[in-house]
Amino acid sequence: MLDLKRIRTDFDTVAAKLKNRGVSEDTLTHLKELDEKRRALLVQSEELKAERNIASAAIAQAKRQKEDATQQIADMQKVSADIKTIDNQLVAIDQQVTDIITVLPNTPHDSVPVGADEEDNVEIRRWGTPRDFDFEVKAHWDLGEDLDILDWERGAKVTGARFLFYKNLGARLERALYNFMLDEHIKEGYQEIITPYMVNHDSMFGTGQYPKFKEDTFELADTNFVLIPTAEVPLTNYYRGEILDGKELPIYFTAMSPSFRSEAGSAGRDTRGLIRLHQFHKVEMVKFAKPEESYQELEKMTANAENILQKLGLPYRVISLCTGDMGFSAAKTYDLEVWIPAQNTYREISSCSNTEDFQARRAQIRYRDEADGKVKLLHTLNGSGLAVGRTVAAILENYQNEDGSVTIPEVLRSYMGGETVISPK
């Protein structure tokens, strides 16, 4: 959530930054007008309360002296009625301010490229060279069926579209991947966490999914619970409402969890395969950092995600998302896109973001600065390290062989009991 004081004092800068994120200046102007009206009413309310206190003291004195206080009482009752009217107006204005400010996206960092959509994203670097196949490559969904390791038909029967069963070495490959990912992140100083897979609505508000993106989630009927769309939500909210010791920062968390997404706006997109599912495993990284260190921590987090792809030998590129393509809470985002041979393109496999104090303000996560003793909002960062199902897809396609088998990447073999290849039955 943005700082209302910043909007008030640096309106033109905030308006210009949010314009690049598709927010109309009229919206901010309306918010500013509401804020000005609210502040004026607060002044009136305080003046009337002071007047009421004086009148109350005068009435008490008149009664002690057995004087007639009828007029003073009538005057005080009118003042009290005026205060109530103003307070009701303030409640209504506060709600309007909340309705606007809670759906405003974060302001982009100055280094973020300006653009309308993914076509305006900027490639930063590439790693690895896509393999030159001398046979016709298969898509990962066909490989999965031919190898009897992915069962889409029964997934659809048991649950519905965009669900599947992992079987045999497919299940072991998935498990090997997330164990490998967690182990690599732990080496980099991340604390492993097993989170709840359901969170309450306050947690969804804290990380920015609510109220704007409710339709993208699975809520449990007649409860305050939501299935997590990413472990970012419980990990970030771990410290919601707390004040941390500045000497402890930065703090690194990692967790593997299922992620549940309705994919409300994705009808007709990626209807086959592991790219877009309602339920999938993902290893998440979350950081809590001091403001002056957060962008250095973003670079480190991105490198941690890249490390996984490099050790798996998967070609990828790093993209800096433009203002029009970033997520709601992000101030800056790097996407990692892995090479998918059957599609002859790169597809997103990780997204690493610095939200600055946007989530921390919503969730009230603060720290006490050891330098001056003041309590301040910290910065939160999050990143995929990696989306496990998409990594399975990338391995199946990049490591496929002409005979229909798939070679298991060397770094995963110790996690799979020494298996070196997945062969057709």
From Swiss-Prot:
GO terms for molecular function: ATP binding; catalytic activity, acting on a protein; serine-tRNA ligase activity; transferase activity. GO terms for biological process: selenocysteine biosynthetic process; seryl-tRNA aminoacylation. Its main location: cytoplasm. It catalyses: tRNA(Ser) + L-serine + ATP = L-seryl-tRNA(Ser) + AMP + diphosphate + H(+); tRNA(Sec) + L-serine + ATP = L-seryl-tRNA(Sec) + AMP + diphosphate + H(+). ATP binds at residues 261-263, 348-351. The keyword Zinc does not apply. Pathway: Aminoacyl-tRNA biosynthesis; selenocysteinyl-tRNA(Sec) biosynthesis; L-seryl-tRNA(Sec) from L-serine and tRNA(Sec): step 1/1. It holds the Pfam family tRNA-synt_2b. Keywords: Aminoacyl-tRNA synthetase, ATP-binding, Cytoplasm, Ligase, Nucleotide-binding, Protein biosynthesis. Its EC number is 6.1.1.11. GO terms for cellular component: cytoplasm. The keyword Translocase does not apply. L-serine binds at residues 230-232, 284, 384. InterPro entries: aa-tRNA-synt_IIb (IPR002314), aa-tRNA-synth_II (IPR006195), aa-tRNA-synth_II/BPL/LPL (IPR045864), Ser-tRNA-ligase_type_1 (IPR002317), Ser-tRNA-synth_1_N (IPR015866), SerRS_1_N_sf (IPR042103), SerRS_core (IPR033729), tRNA-bd_arm (IPR010978). Belongs to the class-II aminoacyl-tRNA synthetase family. Type-1 seryl-tRNA synthetase subfamily. Catalyzes the attachment of serine to tRNA(Ser). Is also able to aminoacylate tRNA(Sec) with serine, to form the misacylated tRNA L-seryl-tRNA(Sec), which will be further converted into selenocysteinyl-tRNA(Sec). Consists of two distinct domains, a catalytic core and a N-terminal extension that is involved in tRNA binding. Homodimer. The tRNA molecule binds across the dimer. This is Serine--tRNA ligase. It comes from Streptococcus pyogenes serotype M28 (strain MGAS6180).
